[in-house]
Amino acid sequence: RQAVEGCTGGPILGYRAPRWSLGGAPGGGRRGRASGVVGPALDVLVREGFRYDSSLAPIVHIGDPDWPRDPYRIDRPGGSIVELPPLVGRRFGVPLLFAGGWALRRVPNRVLLRAIEARNPAGAPAVIDVHTWEFDPDPPRVRLPFMYRLAHYGGLRGYRAKLEELLRS
């Protein structure tokens, strides 16, 4: 955190866990693949002065589909933190994380725009995350199992143009 603050010249106010690794339920419940870790992790973020988190995905694979899809405040013993859930949409009737990575690279912009526009009337943000390495259309390749390779490298070619088009829309 200090290294990034040193580079930007400003405070880092938000956090997003790598690979949506918090999982679990906001109160430390039993759903998700990392149950019981959420409460203590949020306590650390509050203690460290973070104002918001965007690590709790409201879908079954990496979080809990019952979590809110709009921003909400989570009260902890040491204070509170705002949770900014990532953009979730539906594709072929299945709720999917549209926020970043393979989905943001692969889902057509018209589908992403529909998901974003559905949030606009309520004034809710469409939270997406962009990884800087994704702007390299030909990054160094590492040996990975097929599904990991597909998720990691799929859709990199043309991604920058796709994102620019999405932002212009």
Residue locations for each model-derived region?
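An active-site-proximal structural segment forming one wall of the substrate-binding cleft
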Residues: 1-7
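C-terminal domain-boundary segment and adjacent tail
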Residues: 106-169
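Active-site-adjacent pocket scaffolds in enzyme catalytic domains
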Residues: 10, 17-129
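Short glycine-/small-residue-rich flexible loop motifs, especially phosphate/cofactor-binding loops
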Residues: 2, 42, 164
